[in-house]
Amino acid sequence: MNEINDNLNKKINEFLQKLDNVYLSIDIDSLDGEKYVGTGYPEKDGFDLDQLKRFIKNIMKSGKVIRSDLVEINPSLDKNNLTVNAGSEILKVILGNRNV
């Protein structure tokens, strides 16, 4: 799995080098829908939260992100606030306040 993550981060970095600015849009249903069900379209075999956070950190380190959003969280469909809490963790990474 680490090799896959490293290869994806490498491709992300190559792509980022071609851009001046980035609008980062994170759809919560990119997470594994078997665990994170608080979305209208849960997807099986999505990212795990730590994996997605590593990708976001990598993108944020580029300094090219000028706007970002996080979409598709539906608390009424969530179980034990797992999806809502995942969204909070993602926003902390985007904002750079990991201890908030």
Describe every region a protein language model picked out:
Residues 1-100:
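Catalytic cores of soluble, metal-dependent hydrolases
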